[in-house]
Amino acid sequence: MAKLLMTIGSLLVLSLPTAASDKVAAEVLNFSEMDRWVRVTDMICGTVLWEENLEAQRRLPVELCSGDDGKAKIQLYIRIGCTRNKTIVKDGVENGATIQF
């Protein structure tokens, strides 16, 4: 009886969906020829990962929380000038992805 309960318990644990604490490794790439101030936000965990200048052509490795589908969502807020700012939201980010701006 105890063995049966342990087997059922193990199967239940293994059948649970992946938790949001799983991470997706990705890169943010400043493809521009100029340094840019950028705020990188993990939209699933709601945390700001970077909030300062990112040099031209620099790659910034980030670890993002994944959702139930195993994919991440990221937001980039880029200051381009006094009045020209840009917000980029990428949904469905997979492991190894490069998000460029």
PLM regions and their residue ranges:
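Short Pro-Gly-centered beta-turn/loop motif in secreted/extracellular proteins
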Residues: R59-K73
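Asparagine-centered strand-capping/turn motif at beta-strand->loop junctions
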Residues: A26-M34
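Short amphipathic beta-strand segments in non-cytosolic proteins
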Residues: R39-W50
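Sec-dependent signal peptide recognition
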Residues: A2-I8
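Short beta-strand segments within Ig-like beta-sandwich modules, predominantly Fibronectin type-III
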Residues: E51-E55
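Extracellular beta-sheet/turn segments enriched in Thr/Pro/Gly and aliphatic residues
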Residues: C82-F101
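N-terminal signal peptide c-region/cleavage motif recognized by signal peptidases
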Residues: S15-P17
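Short beta-strand/loop motifs in extracellular/secreted proteins, especially
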Residues: M34-R39, A72
